[in-house]
Amino acid sequence: MISDKIIMLYPFHAFLVFSGLLILLAGMICARYLKGRRWWLKAHKTLGIAGAASTLSGIMVAVYMVSASAGLNPPAGLHAYIGITVSIMVIFTPFMGFIQLKKRDMRLRAIHRWAGRITIALMIINAYLGWMIVRSF
């Protein structure tokens, strides 16, 4: 049985990851619709880093919750596996963005764009799966 103290951490996990999703969406909207402004790239970078930091903070809360309740057993279920994938993607995507700015390679730009789209899509799917887990309690 999961202790009440562990369950009490769930809102922090949800808040941090969902905030990260909203911040990343703002960064994507900035890149898509505000390119005519001089400040769009700085805003896009700032929002991307802030969104990744918030998301990773929320994932760290989840890792603590799982390790405190299940020990060293790896998490099971689609929500956990997508969460692991998202944690990798929110590091990979900004990294590719910074590299593509230095190299000016269109292939890297496409990888950065698609990685961002996939990351946001996975986060939306995982938010739904997380909500289904919470509803089952």
What does each model-found stretch correspond to?
Residues M1-F137:
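Membrane-embedded alpha-helical bundles that constitute the cytochrome b-like, heme-associated redox core
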